[in-house]
Amino acid sequence: MDDLARVLVAHPFFAELEPAHVTFLVGCTKNVRFRAGDHLVREGDREDTLYLIRQGGVAIEMRRASGEVVCVETLGAGDVIGISLLADAPAHLDCRARESVVALAIDAACLLRKMTEEPSLGLPIAMRLLERTYERLSRARLQHLDIYR
């Protein structure tokens, strides 16, 4: 297993995948860095990358009708950005580095192609993406309830 495969399998999102599946994804993956203030994703952009955060923090932000930017969630090491790539829809939030960020960037088209070619890989990844989506929606719901008490 090469270095990039080791880094992939060490991330919680892929921790339980079979080594052969991780090796299968290495060709879709590269290491990336962002400086504080850099956008990983902008509202309205196509989500063409799945980011696995290794170090640093990312603010998930939205704009109110007034133009005010509100941080709705912060993510850090072990978290994932780009979970809606399966929906093939534009991003509805901004994702901005709060500090220096080190991440793995997985090309969405390559990932989706590999998921289709290898269903024993595709289903576990789709399930992980759905789990992350559910977790985020649950946290957003709790935040919303807390605001209106």
Residue map of PLM features:
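Cytosolic regulatory regions built on CNB/CRP/Popeye-like sensor folds
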Residues: 1-149
